[in-house]
């Protein structure tokens, strides 16, 4: 969390520049597709390793394309005002990944969060943690500043509870059991951080309707609305 706090400049990078970094990340993943597929196959982490890697790469390109298209909007009102709605990053987010599809699910949480300018502390799959070490190598060679992506391995609920209680973590996403989700919500009540939890629901991460979308971008931002008068 401290490392993420030192990377606060990421939120000030323009959306266009963040998009370019994510495109570079997607290209680097693409170049190492066979390596990631072999790693998933060797550890038995995925029943469809090549398909999971391909979906991860396509998802990275999709979020790169969306990074500069979700800043906000301007809306006219019936009175002589316009409203400016700005989507701003939370800051540091905690992300708790599930065991299913350990590469794709982890990246499906990280990508929208950093696309919107957040820094993340992400807990990788508890059952298949080694994929996180390979991902670190990709992040380090993709122009992502140090501290923007921080990967942890270990017991999901214990680490999640620590992040939920941490005052410097502004938002938490949790993919795990219903009991774990309840624990996260209770632990975060003292600092009022928003928690997005699957509460035991198992997503099909290969399905774009469940594993990616504008909902993820919306959940990675906080909305600020400004009213501006005009005319006499």
Question: How should these model regions be labeled?
Answer:
Residues 80, 87-96, 142-232:
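Conserved NAD(P)+-binding/catalytic subdomain of aldehyde/semialdehyde dehydrogenases
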Residues 28, 57, 64, 138, ...:
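Alpha-helical structural signal in soluble globular domains
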Residues 31, 35, 101, 129-130, ...:
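Short alpha-helical
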Residues 1-69:
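Glycine-rich loop-to-alpha-helix module at the N-terminal edge of alpha/beta enzyme cores
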Residues 60, 132-135, 163, 184:
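Hydrophobic packing residues within well-ordered alpha-helices of enzyme cores
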Residues 65, 70-145:
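Conserved small-residue-rich beta-alpha loop and adjacent elements
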Residues 43, 51, 55, 126-130, ...:
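Short beta->alpha linker loops
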